[in-house]
A protein has these predicted regions:
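Glycine-/small-residue-rich beta->alpha transition segments that form the dinucleotide
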Residues: 97, 101-108, 154-155, 298-310
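FAD-site-proximal beta/loop scaffold in flavoenzymes
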Residues: 119-137, 276-277, 281, 292-341
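Dinucleotide-binding/catalytic capping subdomain of oxidoreductase cores
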Residues: 26-33, 162-290, 325
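Glycine-rich dinucleotide-binding loop and its adjacent helix/turn
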Residues: 107-186, 319-327
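Core beta-strand elements of the Rossmann-like FAD/NAD(P) dinucleotide-binding domain
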Residues: 92-97, 144, 292-299
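N-terminal Rossmann-like FAD-binding beta1-loop-alpha1 element of flavoenzymes
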Residues: 6-28, 160-164
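Beta1/beta-strand and adjacent pyrophosphate-binding region of the FAD-binding site
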Residues: 2-12, 144-151
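N-terminal Rossmann-like dinucleotide/flavin-binding domain of flavoprotein oxidoreductases
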Residues: 33, 41-97, 247-262, 266
Length: 341
């Protein structure tokens, strides 16, 4: 009976689900032994360092990972960096197949002036900072201004904006990093804008996350009702199901505004950032809008506009992902998950 030795590089969700797929292929005619190699001391990738701490239910998938790891012929080698401590070619010489499952950990850039100022961060840095990722404990996160801007129209952007706009005591029962809780408790931020380049009908938020926003106990959530009405007209009589769900959720927020709280999270649509203003640090953002340029004064800008893969020596990359054809990179080398997309 053929027995295949497989190395999986990366111990995040993609790596574990690749291992599970191999385990499910095992039968009386073939078997697999799986060695998972992780750069960090702990596994689970984004489930550990990328999920908003106030959404603990998402982390229950770790129980699935534990079940996968407890299967026969599975081993985890943590604290080992592929590309420096061991090369891809060395792995290929020792295994029948090598699977790259390292995810996409680098934040995409806006490519506008001022992006390198102090107070301009990527969500790829900010999110692991508040999630206790060992690489990001010392990140400079200035929260001393009263206004922050989050650029992006997906759930990561919404998570970041929500974390900034929450009453910090709400984070005490969560597994938010202690250094982050301390920083949030001393934060001066009271207004958070979340800005999207296109209209509400194009936003990549998901409706369950949008429907949670009115439940925030200490935060006003503001959406311009006219923006949503215009988006509903643009979406047409039969919009896609996800678009309709999003617009319905946003309209509900827009029609039931709150203003009694000290903290506010406000959505801005059709706002394209042109420049981040400042001399030594962030002082504002200039946006292009359908009604002309608009400047928002702020002391913190966090971009959440997508991710790209971190390169590994010996693996071909292009446009922030591993070069592949249907997951195959080259002979005996494959890629899965965000590093593939």
């Amino acid at each position: 009976m053929p027995h295949f030795k497989v190395a999986i590089v990366g111990a995040g969700p993609a790596g574990y689900f690749a291992a599970q797929a191999l385990q499910n292929l095992a039968n009386e005619e073939q078997s697999f032994s799986i060695d998972m190699i992780e750069r960090l001391p702990t596994p689970w990738g984004l489930v550990r360092s990328g999920v908003a701490p106030d959404h603990p239910k998402i982390k229950t998938v770790s129980k699935v990972f534990e079940k996968i790891a407890n299967q026969e012929n599975f081993r985890l080698f943590a604290n080992v960096e592929v590309g420096s401590e061991i090369t891809i070619n060395q792995l290929k010489s020792k295994y029948d197949a090598v699977i790259i499952a390292t995810g996409s950990s680098l934040g995409k850039k806006l490519g506008i002036p001022g992006e390198d100022l102090r107070g301009s961060l990527s969500a790829a840095v900010f999110v692991p900072w508040y999630n206790s990722h060992p690489d990001f404990v010392g990140v400079d996160t200035p929260l001393d201004a009263d206004t922050a801007v989050v650029v992006g129209a997906g759930n990561v952007a919404m998570d970041v904006a929500r974390m900034l706009a929450l009453e910090p005591s709400e984070l005490d029962p969560t597994d938010t990093a202690e250094h982050a809780i301390d920083a949030f408790k001393s934060s001066n931020i009271r207004k958070v804008y979340i800005s999207a380049r296109r209209g509400p009908e194009h936003a990549a938020f998901t409706s369950p996350e949008l429907r949670e926003l009115p439940k925030l106990e200490h935060t006003n959530v503001v959406i311009n009702k006219e923006d949503i009405k215009a988006a509903i007209l643009r979406a047409g009589a039969e919009p896609e199901k996800d678009v309709k769900s999003n617009l319905d959720a946003m309209l509900l927020i827009a029609e039931n505004p709150k203003s009694e709280h000290e903290r506010t999270m406000e959505f801005l649509f059709q706002h394209t950032p042109k420049e981040i203003l400042g001399t030594d640090r962030v002082e504002g953002v200039v946006y292009s809008t359908p009604h002309g340029d608009v400047t928002i004064k702020c002391g913190l800008v966090i971009t959440a506009i997508g991710y790209q893969a971190q390169g590994i020596d010996g693996v071909p990359y292009e446009n922030g992902k591993v070069v592949n054809t249907d997951g195959r990179v080259e002979e005996n080398l494959y890629v899965v998950g965000w590093a593939k997309r």
